[in-house]
Swiss-Prot record:
Glutamine synthetase (GS) is an unusual multitasking protein that functions as an enzyme, a transcription coregulator, and a chaperone in ammonium assimilation and in the regulation of genes involved in nitrogen metabolism. It catalyzes the ATP-dependent biosynthesis of glutamine from glutamate and ammonia. Feedback-inhibited GlnA also interacts with and regulates the activity of the transcriptional regulator TnrA. During nitrogen limitation, TnrA is in its DNA-binding active state and turns on the transcription of genes required for nitrogen assimilation. The gene is glnA. The record marks 64 as: Important for inhibition by glutamine. This is Glutamine synthetase. GO terms for biological process: glutamine biosynthetic process. It is found in: Cytoplasm.
Length: 446
């Protein structure tokens, strides 16, 4: 979605010309869930004057009830009309930043927190941090009650066409809706697993790209239901097939120059690119809980399903955590392959950026690239060349996060503490459950 700039007068004009009936004021909580306050268009002036309030104590991870009043400050550049609402009175969306009653940004707002880390980046002389995400999702059939089943919509494979790929019509409608909302779609295809899909859209600056991810998820789920399908961004909904990732392709800029590109070096990369990569590798264990926030996330990060399990980097090899795609010039970027679509994009990107800046500020040295298939190396071979494992459970990821000051700085005290507390509860709840697998394994034997 290309960057646009709107004024209050523009918004008033759009609302009147398009006969908008409702305004949806959208924000994202710490767990990555989209929240919204919907108001009639008669409240537009109040919205434009940053006077819309909501109860922050009702949002998980925000505040206690005694300090609950919050204000929504809309980002006017995020104005869009949902195409599917035309028949019932048009609904427009504005993404908002959350502010406290004293007029300062709320420390628990992931979007505002990302802006804080971007300011730190600017203080180091960089002007832009761009993100190109690659979100994947599964489509499951709905039952007669509208509940998701475990029946996939097709048995297609990577880049398959209809009739094997029965989700093609749904995917095409999703693309059309996204384009109507201003997205620049680059590709749309079936992924490796049956029922799995990927739609790639053009990179954008950090905040806009994260806004786009949240909008993308909403559109995918909405249009899927119109096709009697349930779209899920759960990282590993099925055993024995590839899970869904959301690779982050990131690049730093100084003005119009890509700070990662140097045509005079062997790999075409600058010292800044190597230092940034070194910082991401150094802090990878610490940010894994943020980039892979569910118990289920770690069912994806296992050998054999094209997801990274090991902390290393390479130019072409897809088995390490970081890959440097072959494009150079303005397209020079690094691809962080561990991120999954359940991640809060604002928090995941803040953690990755802070990690990279840690590498730049401390002039960290990147290890040698690993060009062999790490999945085929045994533990002794990996340890001999200094390759660490990513955390294998949410519990070990949270432990690594608690020990990492860079990630604490990336998220700020409020988000950091609330996230760890919420995810620790989730882990404790999971570990005390008795699963169907356990009953199948042990009920008769013992």
């Amino acid at each position: 979605m290309p960057k646009r700039t709107f004024t209050k007068d523009d918004i008033r004009k759009f609302a009147e010309e398009e006969n908008v009936r409702y305004l949806r004021l959208q924000f994202t909580d710490i767990l990555g869930t989209i929240k919204n306050v919907e108001v009639p268009v008669s409240q537009l002036e109040k919205v434009l004057d940053n006077e819309m309030m909501f109860d922050g104590s009702s949002i998980e991870g925000f505040v206690r009830i005694e300090e609950s009043d919050m204000y929504l400050h809309p980002d006017l550049d995020t104005w869009v009309i949902f195409p599917w609402t035309a028949g019932q009175g048009k609904v427009a969306r504005l993404i908002c930043d959350v502010y406290k009653t004293d007029g300062t940004p709320f420390e628990g707002d992931p979007r505002a927190n990302l802006k804080r880390v971007l300011k730190e980046m600017e203080d180091l002389g960089f002007t832009d941090f761009n993100l190109g995400p690659e979100p994947e999702f599964f489509l499951f059939k709905l039952d007669e009650k509208g509940e998701p089943t475990l029946e996939l919509n097709d048995d297609g494979g990577y880049f398959d066409l209809a009739p094997t790929d029965l989700g093609e019509n749904c995917r095409r409608d999703i693309v059309l809706e996204l384009e109507d909302m201003g997205f620049d779609i680059e590709a749309s295809h079936h992924e490796v697993a049956p029922g799995q899909h990927e739609i790639d859209f053009k990179y954008a600056d950090a905040v806009t790209a994260c806004d786009n991810i949240q909008t993308f998820k909403l559109v995918v789920k909405t249009i899927a239901r119109k096709h009697n399908l349930h779209a899920t961004f759960m990282p590993k909904p099925l055993f024995g097939v590839n899970g869904s990732g959301m690779h982050f392709n990131v690049s730093l800029f100084k003005g119009k120059e890509n700070a990662f590109f140097d045509p005079n070096t062997e790999m075409g990369l600058t010292e800044t690119a190597y230092q940034f990569t070194a910082g991401v590798l150094k802090n990878a264990r610490g940010f894994t809980a943020v980039c892979n926030p569910l118990v289920n996330s770690y069912k994806r990060l296992v050998p054999g399903y094209e997801a990274p399990c090991y902390i290393a980097w390479s130019g072409k090899n897809r088995s390490p955590l970081i890959r440097v795609p072959s494009s150079r010039g303005l397209s020079t970027r690094i691809e962080v392959r561990s991120v999954d679509p359940a991640a809060n994009p604002y928090m995941a990107l803040a953690a990755i950026l802070e990690s990279g800046l840690d590498g730049i500020k401390n002039k960290l040295k990147v290890p040698e690239p690993v060009n062999q298939n790490i999945y085929e190396m045994n533990r002794e071979e990996r340890e001999a060349v200094g390759i660490q494992d990513l955390p294998s459970t949410l519990y070990t990821a949270l432990k690594a996060m608690r020990e990492n000051e860079v990630i604490k700085k990336a998220l700020g005290n409020h988000i950091y503490n609330q996230f760890i507390n919420s995810k620790s509860i989730e882990w404790d709840y999971y570990r005390t459950q008795v699963s169907e697998w356990e009953r199948d394994q042990y009920m008769k034997q013992y």
